[in-house]
Amino acid sequence: MKDLTAKQRSVLIFIEEFIEKNGYPPSVREIARRFRITPRGAQLHLVALEKKGYIERKNGKPRAMRVTKSVKNRVPLIGEIRAGEKKEAIEYLEDYIEVPGSFLSSGYEHFLLRVKGESMIEEHICDGDLVLIRRQDWAQNGDIVAAMVEGEVTLKKFFQRGEMVELRPANKEMSPMFFRADRVKILGKVVGVFRKI
């Protein structure tokens, strides 16, 4: 089965959630209304989903479709993040990985990053782990975040005091980093850690 565009993925998730809630699939018009596109645009998304093997439809019958491959709990793995010195993140779509739905917050995008380094070992985040990030541009003190500073990304605990931000490692062998708040961009908060044994 071929990869989906972001919009096709969103349409497929909408179809799955609609079926869960109502017991039947949405109409073409309901899909069009939800995504603020024309019915023809919605129809083209359905054709693409069918060609890629994610849904099956019966010609000529409204609402006669079923999902053949779920993507609802599949999250993109988009590269590596350094848990050590801040480094340029390597961002590219490696794969989609299924995660338990209980880890996903409704209304938020999520992504996975592979951890490189040992600055977060006292929080049980180790080299090679996958961290599940809930995409958000804010954090509370003590949150573990993926943060960008001057184009480089790091995984640290976040603390803000006035105009200063501390990005603190969870490894007593390493020192915290301090920056003006306007130099730190929060990419998201860690909401899960996955490890192969």
From Swiss-Prot:
<keyword id="KW-0742">SOS response</keyword>
<dbReference type="GO" id="GO:0006260">
    <property type="term" value="P:DNA replication"/>
</dbReference>
<keyword id="KW-0235">DNA replication</keyword>
<dbReference type="GO" id="GO:0006508">
    <property type="term" value="P:proteolysis"/>
</dbReference>
<dbReference type="GO" id="GO:0009432">
    <property type="term" value="P:SOS response"/>
</dbReference>
<dbReference type="GO" id="GO:0004252">
    <property type="term" value="F:serine-type endopeptidase activity"/>
</dbReference>
<dbReference type="InterPro" id="IPR036390">
    <property type="entry name" value="WH_DNA-bd_sf"/>
</dbReference>
<dbReference type="InterPro" id="IPR006199">
    <property type="entry name" value="LexA_DNA-bd_dom"/>
</dbReference>
<keyword id="KW-0805">Transcription regulation</keyword>
<keyword id="KW-0068">Autocatalytic cleavage</keyword>
<dbReference type="InterPro" id="IPR039418">
    <property type="entry name" value="LexA-like"/>
</dbReference>
<dbReference type="Pfam" id="PF01726">
    <property type="entry name" value="LexA_DNA_bind"/>
</dbReference>
<dbReference type="InterPro" id="IPR015927">
    <property type="entry name" value="Peptidase_S24_S26A/B/C"/>
</dbReference>
<keyword id="KW-0227">DNA damage</keyword>
<dbReference type="GO" id="GO:0045892">
    <property type="term" value="P:negative regulation of DNA-templated transcription"/>
</dbReference>
<keyword id="KW-0234">DNA repair</keyword>
<feature type="active site" description="For autocatalytic cleavage activity">
    <location>
        <position position="119"/>
    </location>
</feature>
<dbReference type="Pfam" id="PF00717">
    <property type="entry name" value="Peptidase_S24"/>
</dbReference>
<keyword id="KW-0804">Transcription</keyword>
<dbReference type="InterPro" id="IPR050077">
    <property type="entry name" value="LexA_repressor"/>
</dbReference>
<protein>
    <recommendedName>
        <fullName>LexA repressor</fullName>
        <ecNumber>3.4.21.88</ecNumber>
    </recommendedName>
</protein>
<feature type="site" description="Cleavage; by autolysis">
    <location>
        <begin position="83"/>
        <end position="84"/>
    </location>
</feature>
<dbReference type="InterPro" id="IPR006197">
    <property type="entry name" value="Peptidase_S24_LexA"/>
</dbReference>
<comment type="similarity">
    <text>Belongs to the peptidase S24 family.</text>
</comment>
<dbReference type="InterPro" id="IPR036388">
    <property type="entry name" value="WH-like_DNA-bd_sf"/>
</dbReference>
<dbReference type="InterPro" id="IPR006200">
    <property type="entry name" value="LexA"/>
</dbReference>
<keyword id="KW-0238">DNA-binding</keyword>
<dbReference type="GO" id="GO:0006281">
    <property type="term" value="P:DNA repair"/>
</dbReference>
<keyword id="KW-0678">Repressor</keyword>
<feature type="DNA-binding region" description="H-T-H motif">
    <location>
        <begin position="28"/>
        <end position="47"/>
    </location>
</feature>
<comment type="subunit">
    <text>Homodimer.</text>
</comment>
<dbReference type="InterPro" id="IPR036286">
    <property type="entry name" value="LexA/Signal_pep-like_sf"/>
</dbReference>
<keyword id="KW-0378">Hydrolase</keyword>
<comment type="function">
    <text>Represses a number of genes involved in the response to DNA damage (SOS response), including recA and lexA. In the presence of single-stranded DNA, RecA interacts with LexA causing an autocatalytic cleavage which disrupts the DNA-binding part of LexA, leading to derepression of the SOS regulon and eventually DNA repair.</text>
</comment>
<feature type="active site" description="For autocatalytic cleavage activity">
    <location>
        <position position="156"/>
    </location>
</feature>
<dbReference type="GO" id="GO:0003677">
    <property type="term" value="F:DNA binding"/>
</dbReference>
